[in-house]
Design a protein with these regions (language model features):
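Gly/Ser/Thr/Pro-enriched helix-cap/hinge segments flanking short amphipathic alpha-helices
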Residues: 4-12, 16-35, 55-224
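Extended, hydrophobic alpha-helical segments in both membrane/secreted and soluble proteins
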Residues: 35-40, 52
Length: 224
């Protein structure tokens, strides 16, 4: 019909940036069984590849419509090539059976592993401690006056010719959520430096040592 637009794709879909175009790739079937509101992107297992968490379910439907609440919060581990494997509740340890909404990540206990917080509609917010991931490098950013958290700062680990995924410090992430400003990056064998791009321009290379667990960076002060 003229003037109307119709949706034809309803899967939760990942869009891979192929340089000048995006490639749509539907997430695995287990992540399609319930609507997702919040999404968290982090390296939960510490293998250097980004993983996903989906906060799922929508139960307040009208009397004639079934509830969409078959999810329990879905964790998907990535292989760095755009493929993801779903983990069940017993393997991930995460079970959010209510109506998940916001999801955010942070290393709340400073052990070098990314933890997860999930908000629910009409129920308590849950905190999931990551006790099995490989500890990474904790990066504290001081963006200076007007931007103390360094919002907009991008960074990645350098290991020889290899480069890790780019992370950006953001003021918002997903459904009414904000990840912790401190970033955790996987430290593969041979990691020698942290590449940084500052939000007001300019790039910086910060040396890191094998086994180093934390670094503080600033665009106007020596790194430590």
């Amino acid at each position: 019909m003229q003037g109307l637009s119709f949706a034809t794709t309803f899967e939760h879909t990942l869009f891979l940036n192929r340089g000048g175009r995006f490639e749509a790739r539907a997430l695995p079937r287990a992540s399609q069984i319930a609507p997702a509101f919040g999404i968290a992107i982090a390296d939960f297992d510490g293998d250097g590849h980004e993983d996903l968490f989906l906060a799922q379910n929508f139960s307040p439907t009208d009397a004639s419509t079934m509830r969409f609440d078959a999810g329990a919060g879905q964790l998907l581990v990535g292989d760095g090539r755009g493929n993801f494997r779903t983990l069940g509740v017993l393997e991930s340890g995460i079970a959010v059976v209510g109506d998940g909404r916001g999801a955010a990540v942070a290393d709340y206990d400073a052990d070098g592993r990314v933890d997860l917080a999930v908000a629910q509609n009409g129920a308590e917010t849950t905190l999931w401690h990551n006790g099995r991931g490989v500890p990474g490098l904790r990066v504290k950013v001081n963006g200076g006056v007007g931007n103390p958290l360094g919002i907009g700062t991008q960074m990645r680990i350098v290991a020889g010719a290899a480069r890790g995924p780019v992370r950006e410090v953001r003021a918002g992430s997903g459904y009414w959520s904000m990840d912790g400003a401190l970033t955790v990056l996987a430290m593969p064998p041979g990691a020698t430096a942290l590449w940084v791009r500052w939000p007001l321009g300019g790039e910086q290379i910060v040396p890191v040592k094998p086994g180093q667990r934390e670094v503080s960076i600033s665009p106007s002060a020596p790194n430590r």
